[in-house]
Amino acid sequence: MGTRPDEPGDRMSAPPTDRLAHTSSRGVFVTMGGFGGKTLIQLASTVVLARLLSPADFGLVAMVTAIVGVADLVRDFGLTGAIIQARKLSERMWMSVMWLSVALGIGLMLLIAASAPLIAWLYDEQRLIPLTLAIAPILLVNGLTMPMQARVQRDLRFGTLANIDVVSMLVGVGLGIATAALGWGVWSLVVMSGAGQVYRLVALWVASRPRFGRPHISREVLPLVTTGGSLFGVQLLNYATKNLDNVVIGQQLGPAALGQYSRAYALYLLPMQQLNGTLGRVALPVLSKLQDDPERFRRYTRGALMIIGYLTIPVYAVAAAVSSPLVAILLGPGWEEAATLFSILALAGIAQAIGSVLGWLYLTLGRAHKQLLFFVITRPILIAGYFVGIWWAGVEGLALVFGVLSLLLLIPELVYATSGTFMRVRDILAPIARPLVLAPLCFGAAFAVERATDGMPAILQLVLGVAAGVVPLLASLAIPAYRRDLAQIVGFVKQVRKPARTAPASDAAASGSAEPDEPTGESSAAARSDVDEVILDDAELARERKAEP
C-alpha cells in the first residue's frame, strides 16, 4: 500500500541521520512553544475558574477523573509508547492498532458508565452519578485519538502536534469559562474537558488521514501488545501513585479539601509538563532511533538532563518560596491551603523531573519490563505513604510524605535504571549536580525576601521574591563550570536556528531517486554527527575551556 506524499509513514522508522539533529532540536523548541501556549492558557483558566467555581466543584470532578483515568490507561494499554519505540510498523499493523484502540475505548466507556453508582457509593456522593455518565464518552474519543497522535509523533511532526495541543486547549478552556460564567458550575469543567478532546480528535484525523479498512485485528500487532503490556503495568502503577492521593483525600476529607489539593497539584505539574513534557515528546522517538548508537544516545540524554536541571529545579525552588503571593494572585482568596500544599509538593516535583528521564531510558532501550519490576516494588511504598501521611498530619502530611519518599526512591532507581546498559550513573548525575547545588540558594534568597516583604501587595512580594531567587543563578556564571553549562544550552539553541543540511548535489545526482526534501548523502562525506550538533561535542567544550580567562 503506497504512502501518501505528505505522510512520512514507515520511512520515518529509520530517518536519515544528517537531519535528525535539526529535526530533534527544532522539535524541542516547536513543542516547547506549544507547551508554553498550553501553559499560558491553563494558567488563565486557573485564574478565571478559581474565581467562578468553588473548591468543591474541582473536587467533584477530581473524584471522577481519578477513577476514569484508570480506565483510560487500560484503554491505551501502553500501545502509544510501544508504537513510538518500534523500529518499523506496516500499514496493516497501523489498521490493527486503530481497531484495537477503538474496541477498547467502546468497552471501557460502557464499563465506566455502568459503574457510576459504584463510584458514587465509594465517595458517598450521589452527584457523581451524572458526572460519571457525562465523562465516560471521553474514553471512546481517546480510543480514536491515540493511534493518530502516535503516528504523527512517530513521524516527528512536532509542529502539527504543538498546534493541535494549543488550539484544543483554547477551545476547551474558552467553552469552559463561558459556561462557568453562565452559572453551569461543576458542569463547566466537564464541558472544558470534553470540547478540547473532541476538537483534538477532529484535528488529528485531518492531520493523519487514517485508513481504518475493514474491522480486523491482525496477529502482527501482538509484539506491540507484548511491549505495551509492560508499559501498561508501569503506567498503571504510576497512575495509582499519582491519583490514589485524590481518592484518599476525597474519601477521608471530602470535596472541599480535595479541591484545594487538586489546584495545588495542578500548579505543581505545570513546570514539569512544560519542560519534561516538551523534551519527552521529542526525546522518545529520537532516542528510539539512536538506541544502537550508545555515544550519541548518551550525549542527547545528558543534554536533555542539563536543560531539565537548570530550567526545572530552580523554578520549583523559587516557586515554593513565593507560593503564598503566587497562589493569591493566581487563585484569589480562599485558596491559602493550596499555597502551603504547593510548597510541599515542590519536593516531589524535583524528584519526578529527574525521574522522568529514567523512564525514557527504560522505554527507548526496550527495558520496560525492568521498570515494571521496580515499580511493583516501590510504588506500593509511596501509596502506603499516603495513608501514613494523612493519618499523621492530614493533607499536608500526605503531601510531605509523598515528596520525601519520591526523593529517597530516586537514588536506588538511578543505579537500577542504568545497570546492564551503556548508560552510567554519572551520565545522569553530572548534568544535574550544579543545578541541585543552586536550588537551596535560590529558595533561601527568594524565601527571605518574601518574608521580609510580608504585608506588601502580593504582586510586589512575588516580583521581589522571584528577583531574589534569580540572583544565585546569575552569580553562578562567575564560575567557569556554570559558564560551560550555559554554552552547551546556547549551542542547542543555535542548532535550532541553523537550516537543516542537505546532501551535496553530487550525492543527490548519484542517487537518482531522491526526493527534493530528503537528505541523500549518508556516506562518509557527512560532516558532524546528528546528535553531536544538538549538544556541543567534547572538542568544542575543550576549546571553550581554553578560551575562558
For the regions a protein language model found, what residue spans apply to each?
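Membrane-proximal transmembrane or re-entrant/amphipathic helices at the cytosolic face
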Residues: 2-18, 418, 423-425, 444-549
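Membrane-interface junctions at transmembrane-helix termini in multi-pass inner-membrane proteins
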Residues: 24-25, 82-90, 141-165, 182, ...
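Hydrophobic alpha-helical transmembrane segments
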Residues: 129-136, 164-210, 223-229, 234, ...
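Transmembrane helical elements of multi-pass membrane transporters/channels
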Residues: 27-42, 189-192, 196, 200, ...
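Alpha-helical transmembrane segments of multi-pass membrane transport and lipid-handling proteins
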Residues: 2-9, 13, 99-124, 130, ...
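Specific pore-lining/lateral-gate transmembrane helices of multi-pass inner-membrane transport
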Residues: 85-101, 260-376, 492-494, 498
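Interhelical loop/hinge segments that connect adjacent transmembrane helices in multipass membrane
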Residues: 3, 9-20, 24, 159, ...
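Signature of the first transmembrane helix
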Residues: 2-10, 20-77, 104-116, 133, ...
